[in-house]
């Protein structure tokens, strides 16, 4: 089933776990701080009884959803064919601070690598192989992407601005795109 750390969890470390066939979120945290997730494997989820309004959780919901947190690091993890991989900051108004993703491998993932809303995010040295929408910035998210490697990915960067949600931005430095695309 996976698990969620809720409200005021602090100094959490999750490591060396493998998540498969989860119907909802595999590993999530809400309103917590100092969260370190590393050396984990996230395989495709499975929900045979998706009765939600969204009707898109047949492959599970988020592998790693982090909402309203501060000081989150996700490192040395492997994501295999996950659908909604990682949502950071799920609100239009609640600011989340200081998220870092480094040395992760995204293999054949569909979207949210991660999707960020109201987040300051630093990403470096991640590898994306045959993925869909990768870094997706919305609602005042600020992303620094350094030395990422994208291979065979269809949309490496996506920025969605809205007058009601604020302007997001992605700054990419040293990223390499091989047989990959991005939307301006």
Per-region residue spans from a language model:
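N-terminal carbohydrate-binding/catalytic regions of secreted carbohydrate-active enzymes
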Residues: 1-28, 182-183
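Right-handed parallel beta-helix
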Residues: 10-21, 33-53, 62-63, 68-90, ...
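A short beta-strand motif that forms part of the nucleic acid-binding face
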Residues: 139
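Outer-membrane beta-barrel pore domains
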Residues: 166-167, 182-184
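Helix-rich interaction surfaces within compact, conserved domain-sized segments
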Residues: 26-30, 35, 157, 162
């Amino acid at each position: 089933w996976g698990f969620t750390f809720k409200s005021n969890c602090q100094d959490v470390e999750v490591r060396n776990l493998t998540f498969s066939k989860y119907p909802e979120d595999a590993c999530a945290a809400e309103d917590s701080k100092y969260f370190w997730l590393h050396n984990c494997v996230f395989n495709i989820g499975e929900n045979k009884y998706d009765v939600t309004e969204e009707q898109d959780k047949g492959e599970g919901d988020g592998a790693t959803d982090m909402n309203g947190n501060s000081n989150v690091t996700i490192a040395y993890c492997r994501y295999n064919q996950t659908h909604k991989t990682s949502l950071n900051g799920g609100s239009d108004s609640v600011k989340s601070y200081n998220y870092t993703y480094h040395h992760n491998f995204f293999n054949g993932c569909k979207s949210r690598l991660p999707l960020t809303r109201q987040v300051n995010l630093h990403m470096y040295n991640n590898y994306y192989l045959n993925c869909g929408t990768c870094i997706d910035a919305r609602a005042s998210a600020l992303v620094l992407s350094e030395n990422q490697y994208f291979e065979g990915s269809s949309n490496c960067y996506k920025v969605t601005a809205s007058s009601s949600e604020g302007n997001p931005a992605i700054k990419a430095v040293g990223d390499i795109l091989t047989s990959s695309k991005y939307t301006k």
